[in-house]
Amino acid sequence: VQWTAEEKQLITGLWGKVNVAECGAEALARLLIVYPWTQRFFASFGNLSSPTAVLGNPKVQAHGKKVLTSFGDAVKNLDSIKNTFSQLSELHCDKLHVDPENFRLLGDILVVVLAAHFGKDFTPDCQAAWQKLVRVVAHALARKYH
């Protein structure tokens, strides 16, 4: 994947302002609420019976932070995202058997969360760069499935 200097700047500039714990928890919670069938991968998380339960679930919050923290590795390694996520791809494919479509869904939700948090700063150009990034990350995570 080729990144322009502008795309790199838009991604890293916004990433520097992201509250990883808050945005990560919100993104994962939204995934579980908007696409409830994804909850089957999180049966060990306890009560996911309602949006309120999901939003208040400490395991959702902790895992959301973990997910977005690892997403930060993509931001730091834009030119080697496939390598950066090869172990996570193996884990999610071989051990967890996660449907790779869920990576795309989570990426799209992350874009929604960033738009909600950053408003006018999340310009169409910024959105395009982030949409490209989440697509590349989803593809890297799905790599072991192919």
From Swiss-Prot:
Transport keyword on record: yes
Pfam families assigned to the protein according to its UniProt record, in alphabetical order: Globin
GO cellular component: blood microparticle; haptoglobin-hemoglobin complex; hemoglobin complex
Record domain Globin: where: 2-146
Molecular function as annotated in GO: haptoglobin binding; heme binding; metal ion binding; organic acid binding; oxygen binding; oxygen carrier activity; peroxidase activity
Residue sites binding heme b per the record: H63, H92
Known role: Involved in oxygen transport from the lung to the various peripheral tissues.
Family membership: Belongs to the globin family.
Record's protein name: Hemoglobin subunit beta
Lineage: Eukaryota, Metazoa, Chordata, Craniata, Vertebrata
Gene (UniProt): HBB
